[in-house]
C-alpha cells in the first residue's frame, strides 16, 4: 500500500489591508503572506472501500465532514469519479484557531497529495480551482512561499524576493473567530496598510523598508477585544524584536529577527508569558 506524505507549512501575514466591502457582504482584502517552517504533515493512503477516513493527533480537530480535509477528498472524488476510498492522517504542529492558516494548509496539502495518490495529473490552475471551492486561503497554500494575495484569495502573485528571517511566534491561550472580526470593520476609520511598499521592499531585499511598512488592518479590532495581544507585541519589541505584528485576525503574534541570538532573546522573554511559543524560520 503506497502512502503519500505532504508537508503543510503555516503562514504569517507580513501585510493585511482591507480595501472595502463588496455587495455580497464580504470584504476585499489585499495581503502579503509568507510560509514558515512550522508545519503539519498530511498522509494519505488508499482504501478499497469507498469511504473517507480522517485521523488526527489533535483532539481539537473535527475528524468528520466539517473538516476541510474531508471536504477536499469528497470534492475530488465527486469531480473526478474516484471510486476508491482514502485514509487521511493529520499530524498537527500548527496551533488551531491561530490565524496561521493551519486548516487551509492541511486542505492544500491534501489536494496535492490526492493528485499524486490518484495520478490525476492536475495542473496548478486545476488544483487552485479546487482550493477556491474550499476556502479563501487554500489557493495560496497550494503554492505557498511568499506572495501577494487579492480578491477572494484567487489572485496570487508570487513575489520575487527572499526574506530569510527568524520568526518567534506567540499563540495566546484564547482564540478569535475571523467571522466575528469582519462585521466590526469600518473601512473609513481602519488603519490602512501599504501593500505595494511591502512588495517593493521584499523584491528589493530591503529589510529596513519591510519592517517599516508591515501592518495588519485587523489588529486594532482584535486588540480592542483582547488587549493581551498588545502586551505580547510590546514585550517582544522590548526584548529586541525588529517588528512584532498580529497575523490574520489573531490572536497569534509574531516577531521578525535577523539573527538567532536576537530570536533567542525574544523567545526567552515570552516563554513564560504564554504556553505556546515557537522559534522558526521563513521558508
Curated annotation (Swiss-Prot):
Assigned EC number: 2.7.1.148
BP terms from Gene Ontology: terpenoid biosynthetic process
One MF term in the entry's GO annotations: 4-(cytidine 5'-diphospho)-2-C-methyl-D-erythritol kinase activity
Swiss-Prot/TrEMBL catalytic activity: 4-CDP-2-C-methyl-D-erythritol + ATP = 4-CDP-2-C-methyl-D-erythritol 2-phosphate + ADP + H(+)
Binding site for ATP: 95-105
Annotated InterPro entries: GHMP_kinase_C_dom, GHMP_kinase_C_sf, GHMP_kinase_N_dom, IspE, Ribosomal_Su5_D2-typ_SF, Ribsml_uS5_D2-typ_fold_subgr
Active site (catalytic residues): 11, 137
Highest rank taxon of the organism: Bacteria
Keyword terms of this UniProt record: ATP-binding, Kinase, Nucleotide-binding, Transferase
Function: Catalyzes the phosphorylation of the position 2 hydroxy group of 4-diphosphocytidyl-2C-methyl-D-erythritol.
Family from the record: Belongs to the GHMP kinase family. IspE subfamily.
Protein name: Putative 4-diphosphocytidyl-2-C-methyl-D-erythritol kinase
Organism: Streptococcus uberis (strain ATCC BAA-854 / 0140J)
Lineage: Bacteria, Bacillati, Bacillota, Bacilli, Lactobacillales
Gene: ispE
Amino acid at each position: 500500500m503506497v502512502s503519500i506524505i505532504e508537508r503543510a507549512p503555516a503562514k504569517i501575514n507580513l501585510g493585511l489591508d482591507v480595501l472595502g466591502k463588496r455587495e455580497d457582504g464580504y470584504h476585499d482584502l489585499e495581503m502579503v503572506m509568507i510560509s514558515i517552517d512550522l508545519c503539519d504533515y498530511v498522509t494519505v493512503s488508499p482504501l478499497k472501500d469507498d469511504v473517507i477516513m480522517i485521523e488526527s493527533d489533535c483532539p481539537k480537530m473535527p475528524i468528520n465532514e466539517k473538516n476541510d480535509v474531508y471536504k477536499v477528498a469528497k470534492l475530488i472524488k465527486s469531480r473526478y469519479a474516484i471510486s476508491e476510498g482514502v485514509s487521511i492522517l493529520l499530524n498537527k504542529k500548527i496551533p488551531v484557531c491561530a490565524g496561521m492558516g493551519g486548516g487551509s494548509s492541511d486542505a492544500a496539502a491534501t489536494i496535492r497529495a490526492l493528485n499524486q495518490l490518484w495520478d490525476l495529473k492536475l495542473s496548478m490552475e486545476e488544483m487552485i480551482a479546487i482550493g477556491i471551492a474550499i476556502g479563501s486561503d487554500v489557493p495560496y497554500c497550494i503554492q505557498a512561499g511568499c506572495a501577494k494575495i487579492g480578491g477572494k484569495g484567487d489572485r496570487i502573485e508570487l513575489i520575487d524576493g527572499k526574506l530569510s528571517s527568524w520568526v518567534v511566534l506567540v499563540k495566546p491561550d484564547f482564540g478569535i473567530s475571523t467571522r466575528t472580526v469582519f462585521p466590526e470593520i469600518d473601512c473609513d476609520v481602519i488603519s490602512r496598510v501599504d501593500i505595494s511598499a511591502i512588495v517593493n521592499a521584499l523584491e528589493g531585499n530591503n529589510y529596513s523598508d519591510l519592517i517599516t511598512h508591515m501592518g495588519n488592518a485587523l489588529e486594532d479590532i482584535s486588540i480592542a477585544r483582547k488587549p493581551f495581544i498588545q502586551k505580547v507585541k510590546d514585550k517582544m519589541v522590548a526584548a529586541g524584536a525588529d517588528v512584532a505584528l498580529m497575523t490574520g485576525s489573531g490572536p497569534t503574534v509574531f516577531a521578525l529577527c535577523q539573527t538567532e541570538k536576537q530570536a533567542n532573546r525574544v523567545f526567552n522573554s515570552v516563554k513564560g508569558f504564554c504556553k505556546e511559543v515557537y522559534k522558526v524560520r521563513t521558508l
